[in-house]
Curated annotation (Swiss-Prot):
UniProt entry keywords in alphabetical sequence: Lyase
HAMAP family noted in UniProt: Cyanate_hydrat (MF_00535)
A Pfam family annotated for this UniProt entry: Cyanate_lyase
This protein's name: Cyanate hydratase
Length: 163
């Protein structure tokens, strides 16, 4: 399960993350697991798994038990650290400075109104949910050997109510 590319955490760069982030990332690094490795073992999507590590998603009791087992973290500690509700949206300053996260921000800056226009034409007046939502990341390699990142966003369409 050991991989060359391993996401780790420099807590000095992320002052707003919860204590659970440090616990989870330290155990992840010690075992040299990727988010894909962990997600397969706990039965979650790898982006959802990473979101738990960054304090941006709620871990179920089953998630907590599975993470404790897979990462060899005391269950009681994880239960204490992951029992609350996430304080979403505080982990990234705006605009973001980290280049990859900034590129995602830039995509919304450049194409946000285009997405909105096309979505409104297809679905009517409303929004795409980020709560009834799923996402995944895939890697594609073209015929020339170039690697492409494919990010799929899937959100329930919520029409605005007339009142």
């Amino acid at each position: 399960m050991s991989h060359l590319n391993l996401a780790t955490l420099d807590t000095s760069q992320h002052p707003y993350l919860p204590a659970s982030s440090q616990t989870l990332f330290a155990a992840k690094a010690k075992r040299k697991f990727t988010f894909e490795d962990i997600s397969k073992q706990i039965g979650r999507n790898e982006v959802a798994t990473a979101a738990i590590f960054y304090g941006q998603a709620k871990a179920s009791a089953e998630d907590i038990a599975n993470l404790a087992k897979v990462l060899d973290i005391p269950l009681k500690l994880l239960e204490e650290q992951l029992s609350g509700f996430p304080d979403r949206g505080r982990s990234v300053e705006m605009p973001p400075k980290e280049p990859l996260i900034y590129r995602l921000y830039e995509i919304v800056q450049n194409y946000g109104y285009a997405y909105k226009a096309v979505l409104n034409e297809k679905f009517g007046d409303g929004i795409m949910s980020a709560i009834s939502f799923s996402t995944k990341v895939e890697k594609e390699t073209d015929a020339d050997g170039n690697n492409w990142a494919v990010i799929t966003l899937r959100g329930k369409w919520l029409p605005f109510s007339r009142f």
